[in-house]
């Protein structure tokens, strides 16, 4: 047996990438790894930046998958949407794990650079707002933090002009012969829809005969799976913030933990949760 170091070239691996696309070229790693610019000398600021930048990358993928799932549902091609929604759930499972890394930063360590953040805050995240709007939580007041970027505001308005993910699921219910009341006549999608007894009754019928309505049943469960992970992400956000800054006002001027706790009260797909009590 030779003690010589292993050389992948002996098995045909390419080792010279002059004039060829390498791993780093494809992923544009030079740009990506140059995108962290701490404003202080604090050791933990790099952790804080990377935590939020990687979250934004995962959110970009979540938006891609949610939009694709919505398009599939709208054209009655429901089964591909199951895979896409399952992937979104896994994305938020990944995002949940990321809080564990950020929680290794102590309050004392955060205070060393918190003042460098100015008024920047996670609630100003354009991609997070896009996800909320795509899911149907359409608080129009949250357009205002993006007013200084007309192109971002226009993109959010474009989302608001169309049905949400849940709206598309309800429209599918209607196309499959279920009565969904006022939701069947909606043409203005800008606001957050009201909970509906007719929609609850329709979903209850699906759950009482899942074999007959398998695609609708599976879609509903994929939506509940996702909201379950999304709720955990919100909860972990609250506990992480409370652990690090307590009940201080947030850098963006919100009430911090109290603001985040209010977000825990939002239910994206209310009828899908409430029907369980009556089954």
Curated annotation (Swiss-Prot):
Homotetramer. InterPro entries: Trp/Indoleamine_2_3_dOase-like, Trp_2-3-dOase_bac, Trp_2_3_dOase. Pfam families: Trp_dioxygenase. The lineage of its organism: Bacteria, Pseudomonadati, Pseudomonadota, Alphaproteobacteria, Hyphomicrobiales. Its cofactor is heme. It comes from Bradyrhizobium sp. (strain ORS 278). Keywords: Dioxygenase, Heme, Iron, Metal-binding, Oxidoreductase, Tryptophan catabolism. Heme-dependent dioxygenase that catalyzes the oxidative cleavage of the L-tryptophan (L-Trp) pyrrole ring and converts L-tryptophan to N-formyl-L-kynurenine. Catalyzes the oxidative cleavage of the indole moiety. Pathway: Amino-acid degradation; L-tryptophan degradation via kynurenine pathway; L-kynurenine from L-tryptophan: step 1/2. This is Tryptophan 2,3-dioxygenase. The gene is kynA.
């Amino acid at each position: 047996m030779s003690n010589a170091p292993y050389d992948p070239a002996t098995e045909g691996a390419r080792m010279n990438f002059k004039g060829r696309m390498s791993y780093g070229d494809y992923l544009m790693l030079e740009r990506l790894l140059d995108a962290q610019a701490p404003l202080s000398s604090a050791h933990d600021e790099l952790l804080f930046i990377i935590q939020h930048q990687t979250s934004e990358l995962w959110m970009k993928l979540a938006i891609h998958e949610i939009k694709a799932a919505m398009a599939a549902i709208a054209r009655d091609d429901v089964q591909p949407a199951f895979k896409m929604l399952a992937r979104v759930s896994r994305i938020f499972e990944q995002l949940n794990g990321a809080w564990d890394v950020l929680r290794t930063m102590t309050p004392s360590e955060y205070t060393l650079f918190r003042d460098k953040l100015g008024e920047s805050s996670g609630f100003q995240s354009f991609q997070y707002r896009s996800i909320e709007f795509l899911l149907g939580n359409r608080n129009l007041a949250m357009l205002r933090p993006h007013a200084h970027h007309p192109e971002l505001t226009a993109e959010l308005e474009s989302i608001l002009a169309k049905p949400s993910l849940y709206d598309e699921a309800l429209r599918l219910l209607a196309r499959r012969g279920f009565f969904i009341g006022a939701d069947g006549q909606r043409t203005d999608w800008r606001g957050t829809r009201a909970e509906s007894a007719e929609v609850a009754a329709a979903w209850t019928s699906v759950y009482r005969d899942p074999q007959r309505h398998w695609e609708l049943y599976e879609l509903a469960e994929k939506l509940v799976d996702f909201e379950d992970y999304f709720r955990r992400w919100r909860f972990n956000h609250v506990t992480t913030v409370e652990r690090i800054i307590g009940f201080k006002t947030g850098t963006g001027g919100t009430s911090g933990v109290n603001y985040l706790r209010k977000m825990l009260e939002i239910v994206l797909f209310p009828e899908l949760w409430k029907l369980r009590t009556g089954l």
